[in-house]
């Protein structure tokens, strides 16, 4: 007597498809988010209030530190003397040649006058991994 072969039919909504990423537990979702570059965090924060909250949490940055996925960046601030314009930003995609040891914040503040004296640049340099 021949044995009938069992046919496996996959439904269009299998059990694996029913679990959606936004409904994962927080600790698992934090682990996933910690592996993604910070470059994508502004876009991911638009997914939901929960994502925005997790992306702003200290737990995410602690998870990134533990996983070794933290990224170095440089924050800066400049003002123009004549028009009181302010420029600030963040440099991320650079190779860190040398990191500075932690130091007193008052020493991090420095003033520089360019040769034409039209800019007063106050530069706050904060190097850290986030």
UniProtKB/Swiss-Prot annotation:
Location of the F-box domain: 18-64
InterPro entries xref list: F-box-like_dom_sf, F-box/kelch-repeat_ARATH, F-box_dom
Pfam families: F-box
Listed name of the protein: Putative F-box protein At1g77880
Species per Swiss-Prot/TrEMBL record: Arabidopsis thaliana
């Amino acid at each position: 007597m021949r044995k009938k072969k069992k046919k496996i039919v996959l439904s269009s909504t299998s059990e694996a498809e029913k679990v959606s990423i936004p409904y994962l537990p927080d600790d698992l979702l934090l682990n996933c988010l910690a592996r993604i570059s910070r470059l994508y965090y502004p876009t991911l924060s638009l997914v939901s209030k929960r994502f925005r909250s997790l992306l702003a949490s200290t737990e995410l940055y602690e998870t990134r530190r533990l996983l070794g996925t933290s990224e170095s960046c440089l924050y800066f601030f400049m003002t123009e003397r004549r028009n009181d314009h302010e420029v600030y930003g963040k440099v991320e995609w650079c190779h860190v040649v040398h990191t500075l040891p932690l130091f007193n914040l008052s020493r991090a503040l420095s003033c520089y006058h360019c040769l034409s004296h039209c800019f007063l640049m106050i530069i706050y340099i904060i190097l850290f991994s986030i």
